[in-house]
Each structure stands twice: as structure tokens, then as C-alpha cells.
Amino acid sequence: MEYSNIYVSRIMKLCKERGIAINRLATMSDVKQSTLDNIVRGLTKNPRIKTLHKIAIAFNMTLAEFLDFDELNDYVFDEESDE
């Protein structure tokens, strides 16, 4: 999985588990629908920490809890990569 898709996977998984549609998440998190759509579509490769924090709060999680998942924790960076 590409690094930029890790957050997309996390958001989609949490939405599915909690029965929350993306447009509802936008409202709950006070993140613009277009911003969230761009993240989920992979157009925004590196979402701002403030945006991720708002999304975490919408899921009733701390930012640390939101970022604590296997795909991110186990990610290995390519030595040649600037990601």
C-alpha cells in the first residue's frame, strides 16, 4: 500500500465499522466536503495534521488513537523515497 493511501484506508475502515457516510463525517468533523473527498479519492496525498485531528475527534478518538494502526505503524519507507 502506498503511504498516501494509508489514511484513506483508515478513514474508510472506521466509517464502515461505525456506519458513517463520508458526507456525514464531513459534517461531524467540520472538514469541508471537498477536502474530505479529495483525501478519500487520493488527490490530497498529505492531509494536514489539523484535518486529521478533526477527523479523529469526529470518530471520538484522540489523534494518537487515530494514527495508531498496523498499516501506518508497519510501513517501511523506501530509502530512495521522499515520502
Predicted regions and their residues:
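Short, charged recognition helix plus adjacent turn
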Residues: N38, K45, L67-E83
